[in-house]
Amino acid sequence: MNTVIELDDVALTRGETKILNDITWSTHRGEQWAVLGANGAGKTSLVRIASGKVQATSGSVRFDGNPINDLQPQELASRCSLVSLSTTQRLRASMRVIDVVRSAAWGISAPFVETYEDIDTQRARDLLGLFSVDHLEERPFHTLSEGERQRIVLARGLMSDPEVLILD
């Protein structure tokens, strides 16, 4: 099996606080994992490091055999998607649902989606249909229920057809 994500002696500190301490872990294509722990145990920090969203204080992170820091952010975002429920709070509230999903196509930030009209709208519609929320595509994101927002964020996470999907 091919190793997709590999962490070697990864640590993360914030000031004097050690968040993660010498984590070594890897995952291979086709595997499914669950990271369990108490609130504040570092689960979100771990998946954010594994997805390249946060840089470890020490240790190394590799994606598909390459140091994660050597990959362009856009390439990494298209190959490894991190879906976080906290995303629902960071998205621009007035955006239409279809634009929330489309904005993930190239790892662009949601407020600038208007300048990317060539993004694959049909793929976004297909993904909304997959999660049975296609009827909401023109609605402003902030008008949705929390459950609807979560399904929209899942569709958004699949927009780039990532090799790896990390759910937080």
Identify the meaning behind each predicted range.
Residues 36-38:
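The feature captures the beta-strand-to-loop junction immediately N-terminal to the Walker
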Residues 59-69:
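Conserved ABC transporter NBD signature motif
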Residues 165-168:
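Catalytic Walker B motif of ABC-type/P-loop ATPase nucleotide-binding domains
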Residues 115, 140-144, 148:
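Conserved ABC ATPase signature
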Residues 5, 19-22, 137:
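Conserved structural motif at the start of ABC-family nucleotide-binding domains
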Residues 117-136, 161:
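Conserved ABC ATPase "signature" region
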Residues 51:
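Helix-to-loop junction immediately C-terminal to a conserved catalytic motif
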